[in-house]
């Protein structure tokens, strides 16, 4: 990873910030810090350049030293954490020491503590929230959603602003007080370029761009080994839109031919528009998509969302099905906020990469996952007991799957099975159709498919497909990704 910072030719001095994350729990790995990410993104959007992030323990002397140093170097200092009623909440004491002050019970905060907690004794733990440095200012923000004034203020001393450590409170506070930091004289502009080549293959071009434009434009190069569609994300950043566009044009013109990927960053949010556009394209794939959407729409006309779930185990077919289902719901019920229901029949010894993909997909599509161990028939028996409201299950079955040639788009389970309507929108899709659909719309799929696997089961019965094996120029054995398989009949030869 490389990144350069521009020495911008401008008469306007930059407005800068330093962020201090305070908490033993962060340093010990007990809690993941998300506050610095939010603050960096928010501050940059209002013209403030974050120059440094520091994570320090709940120690008064360390807090004081870090704040004193940051306060002298940056326009603003934002701290997060260490505010509360317990012994390790010592941020206010650290701030006071940084400025050579004492803390005292601020009358306004004492009154607020009494109102919120019903406590008035000076020694009670809650009253520690009212004990702040003597030169403190109280900043009351406004909830931008409701227009209501915050009941509890943000404390600041000089150019130091003391935010809570709880992410929801910090985010609400910074949003409601962003006028304290807003810099309308500076606007940051950036462009992203997704590249399918490895970093080493474009290093020379990046060096040339940096040499030409670094005075006005910063260039960052960030490898992403887990992305299905690109290997490196290039980010151009500048205060000057004109310089940014000049650098962007030069870089595009000098990168190797064919390596720039027209990547769609968030295909889920745009699912309905993109999927239905493809369905109306008149292409062979578009016709398959249109037929699948028709089946899904008929299912949604017959069953309410509360009675439908999608069978999802992370494979390529059900990933395509999930995206189609999400798009259909998004189009049919644009105001629908409830989670889509999904059945995950978890096999023995699943690949860790598949488990990770399941987790990320659950979050990406806002799913309510019902996880059941074992084989499909027994899983449906358990599902009927645990979720008796469900009546239909969407399946990613294709006619090329075992025992599937006589199925119809909507058919009941066999008499000796739990009673469900099986909805099969992908019956007439081929292996190539699945991959064309996923990759045309830049839909994320399990990374194992990029490593030579074409059909995924458990770690015990699945190997890389030998039909995808090749030898690199250096003589090493490697595998093409699954979407490059030429003979579809070889899809399952890697399953034992």
Swiss-Prot record:
Localization: Cytoplasm
Cofactor(s) for this UniProt protein: Mg(2+)
SUPFAM superfamilies per UniProt: Adenine nucleotide alpha hydrolases-like, Molybdenum cofactor biosynthesis proteins
GO biological process, one term: FAD biosynthetic process
Pfam families: FLAD1_M, MoCF_biosynth, PAPS_reduct
Pathway connected to this protein: Cofactor biosynthesis; FAD biosynthesis; FAD from FMN: step 1/1
This protein's UniProt keywords: ATP-binding, Cytoplasm, FAD, Flavoprotein, FMN, Nucleotide-binding, Nucleotidyltransferase, Transferase
Transmembrane segments: none
Gene3D superfamilies in UniProt: HUPs, MoaB/Mog-like domain
EC number assigned by the record: 2.7.7.2
Root EC class: transferase
Molybdenum cofactor biosynthesis protein-like: annotated span: 18-109
GO CC annotation terms, alphabetical: cytoplasm
Ranges for region FAD synthase: 307-464
InterPro entries the UniProt entry points to: FAD_synth_MoaB/Mog-bd, FLAD1_M, MoaB/Mog-like_dom_sf, MoaB/Mog_dom, PAPS_reduct_dom, Rossmann-like_a/b/a_fold
Catalytic activity entry: FMN + ATP + H(+) = FAD + diphosphate
GO MF, any single term: ATP binding
Family, similarity comment: In the N-terminal section; belongs to the MoaB/Mog family. In the C-terminal section; belongs to the PAPS reductase family. FAD1 subfamily.
Known role: Catalyzes the adenylation of flavin mononucleotide (FMN) to form flavin adenine dinucleotide (FAD) coenzyme.
Record text about domains: The molybdenum cofactor biosynthesis protein-like region may not be functional.
Listed name of the protein: FAD synthase
Organism: Xenopus laevis (African clawed frog)
């Amino acid at each position: 990873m490389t990144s350069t910072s521009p020495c911008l030719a401008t008469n306007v001095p930059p407005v800068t910030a330093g962020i201090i994350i305070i908490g033993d729990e962060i340093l010990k790995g007990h809690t993941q810090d998300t506050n610095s990410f939010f603050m960096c993104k928010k501050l940059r959007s209002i013209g403030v350049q974050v120059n440094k992030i520091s994570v320090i323990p709940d120690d008064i002397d360390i807090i004081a030293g870090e704040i004193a140093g940051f306060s002298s170097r940056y326009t603003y200092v934002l701290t997060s954490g260490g505010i509360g009623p317990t012994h390790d909440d010592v941020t206010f004491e650290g701030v006071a020491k940084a400025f050579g002050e004492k803390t005292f019970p601020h009358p306004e905060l004492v009154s607020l503590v009494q109102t919120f907690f019903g406590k008035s004794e000076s020694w009670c733990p809650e009253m520690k929230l009212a004990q702040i440095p003597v030169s403190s200012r109280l900043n009351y923000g406004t909830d931008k959603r409701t227009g209501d004034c915050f009941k509890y203020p943000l404390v600041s001393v000089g150019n130091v602003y003391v935010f809570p450590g709880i992410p929801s409170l910090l985010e609400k506070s910074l949003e409601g007080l962003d006028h304290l930091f807003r810099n309308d004289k500076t606007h940051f502009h950036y462009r992203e370029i997704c590249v399918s080549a490895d970093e080493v293959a474009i290093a020379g071009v990046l060096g040339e761009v940096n040499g030409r434009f670094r005075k006005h434009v910063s260039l960052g190069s960030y490898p992403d080994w887990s992305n299905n569609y690109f290997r490196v994300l290039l980010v151009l950043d500048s205060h000057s839109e004109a310089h940014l566009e000049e650098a962007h044009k030069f870089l595009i013109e000098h990168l190797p031919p064919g390596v720039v990927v027209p990547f769609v960053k968030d295909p889920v949010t745009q699912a309905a528009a993109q999927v239905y556009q493809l369905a109306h394209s008149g292409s062979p794939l578009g016709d398959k998509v249109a037929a699948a959407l028709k089946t899904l729409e008929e299912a949604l006309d017959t069953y309410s969302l509360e009675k439908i779930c999608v069978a999802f185990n992370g494979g390529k077919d059900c990933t395509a099905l999930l995206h189609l289902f999400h798009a259909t719901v998004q189009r049919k019920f644009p105001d629908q906020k409830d989670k889509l229901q999904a059945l995950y029949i978890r096999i023995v010894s699943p690949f860790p990469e598949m488990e990770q993909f399941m987790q990320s997909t659950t979050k990406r599509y806002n799913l309510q996952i019902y996880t059941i161990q074992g084989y499909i028939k027994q899983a449906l028996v358990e599902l009927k007991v645990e979720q008796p409201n469900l009546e239909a299950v969407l399946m990613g079955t294709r006619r090329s799957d075992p025992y599937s040639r006589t199925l119809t788009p909507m058919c009941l389970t066999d008499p000796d099975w739990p009673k469900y309507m099986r909805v099969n929108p992908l019956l007439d899709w081929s292996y190539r159709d699945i991959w064309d659909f996923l990759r045309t719309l830049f839909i994320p799929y399990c990374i194992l498919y990029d490593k030579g696997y074409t059909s995924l089961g458990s770690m015990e019965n699945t190997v890389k497909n030998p039909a995808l094996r090749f030898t690199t120029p250096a003589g090493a054995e490697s595998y093409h990704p699954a979407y490059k398989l030429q003979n579809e009949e070889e899809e399952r030869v890697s399953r034992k």
